[in-house]
A protein has these predicted regions:
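Divalent-metal coordination cores built from histidine and acidic residues
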Residues: 3-9, 15, 19, 23-184
Length: 184
C-alpha cells in the first residue's frame, strides 16, 4: 500500500454503544471498526450482526454484552428481564451459551442477587459490568465481583445519595447537582 502523503489511522473501538442498524454505517464512516454493544434487544442485534456478516449492511464488528434487568415500574425493555435470583442466573447461562463475552447488570436488578449472578458469570468465563443497582453502592457491587462499573456517575452517586433515594429514575443524573458541594 502506497500511503505517501496520507494518514493511516487504526480502526477505533467504541467501548459503550447500543447499536441499531442506522448506526452501523455511521460508525464505520467515523472510523469505528468495532463496537462493544452494552445491551440491546437480542433479536434486533442478532439480525444486524447477521446482515453485517453477510455483507448486506456495512457496519463494524460487534462485541455483545448480555443485558440483565430486574422487573420494576422503571425497567428497561432491553435484554432479559428477571424477577428472581434464579432467573438472573438462568439469564447469565443463556448469554454464555450464545457466545456473549460479558453480562451487564442494570438499575432495577435486586442488588442482593449480584454475588450469585457474578459468581455464575465468572464460572462460565464471562465478565460482569453494569450500573449500580438502585439502593446499593458501587462499593457493594465491586465487593460482589463486578469487573467494571459503567458510567462515572454510577461510581460517584454513592458519595451524594441519601438512604432510600431511587436511582432507577432520572434522579441518577439530576443527583449530580450535589457534586459541587461535595467535600471528600
Amino acid at each position: 500500500i502506497d500511503g505517501a502523503g496520507g494518514t493511516l489511522v487504526p480502526g477505533l473501538y467504541e467501548m459503550h454503544g447500543h447499536l441499531a442498524q442506522q448506526d452501523a454505517l455511521l460508525n464505520l464512516l467515523a472510523g469505528i471498526t468495532t463496537v462493544r454493544d452494552m445491551g440491546n434487544t437480542n433479536p434486533v442485534l442478532d439480525v444486524l450482526i447477521d446482515r453485517i456478516g453477510k455483507g448486506e449492511v456495512a457496519g463494524p464488528r460487534i462485541v455483545r454484552s448480555g443485558f440483565i434487568e430486574g422487573k420494576s415500574p422503571f425497567s428497561s425493555a432491553t435484554g432479559k428481564l428477571v424477577e428472581s435470583e434464579a432467573e438472573a442466573i438462568d439469564a447469565v447461562r443463556w448469554y454464555a451459551a450464545r457466545g456473549f463475552w460479558q453480562v451487564k447488570l442494570y438499575n432495577s436488578m435486586d442488588p442482593k442477587w449480584a454475588p450469585a449472578v457474578v459468581a455464575e458469570a465468572h464460572r462460565l468465563g464471562l465478565r460482569v459490568s453494569g450500573h449500580v443497582p438502585a439502593f446499593s453502592s458501587a462499593d457493594e457491587m465491586i465487593a460482589a465481583g463486578f469487573d467494571e462499573v459503567t458510567h462515572v456517575n454510577q461510581l460517584m452517586l454513592g458519595w451524594v445519595l441519601n438512604p432510600g433515594e431511587d436511582t432507577r429514575t432520572l434522579f441518577r443524573f439530576t443527583a449530580m447537582r450535589r457534586f459541587p458541594g461535595l467535600d471528600l
